[in-house]
């Protein structure tokens, strides 16, 4: 059996030795290992892929026995187990299309049991991929009720994380606190950058020379969550606002897809307001 273990705890001597001992004791063999100690917070993180003939329970028991004294946040799962993603969208399709395309190719190791939107425009696209589509229109009056409906679906479908693929609604503090570190958003700027409506028009008006996009975890502070992935492209004085929009869309879809892939492979560790990422 091929297993993946992730660990996070305060840095202290003996953690790596305990991990390797635990894997050896359950008949395991390490295939891949990455580790890092954050010098500021003294937090140790580790991602270890290993194989064992004794099964998941034996591995769990062995790791618990050897590592419990370090009081770690420890997770073990089969590498072929796919995390379950709920996608939220509005009207823009470029990020959603890319996620669905990569999902169909098998390049994203996730399951997508449902796509939810506050508009109806993307229903046909979603259902053409054999994925259920749920239309939940949002207004000032019903926003709280609709968020409760989404949270109910998250519980019902055992969703592991949420992807905001250009979902143009600000999630409430209550919603964000229900899934800390489990909601990924794509922001149309290389943060910090232009906020609000028409960011590419703002960028054009300021004569910027690079534009970009940022994928980050959602918190109750708008667009201030820990950054997962970023990318940029160079532009010039001859680039129109429409040029910037087209270039920006391409960056957005790539950055969001990379963030989803990193999350699905348990490569992201949250340490305060920062992320540690094993590529």
What do these predicted regions represent?
Residues 1-10:
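Short glycine-/aliphatic-rich beta-strand segments at the starts of folded cytosolic domains
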Residues 1-2, 26-35, 40:
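N-terminal short leaders/motifs
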Residues 12-32:
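Short amphipathic alpha-helix segments
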Residues 36-279:
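One-carbon transfer enzymes
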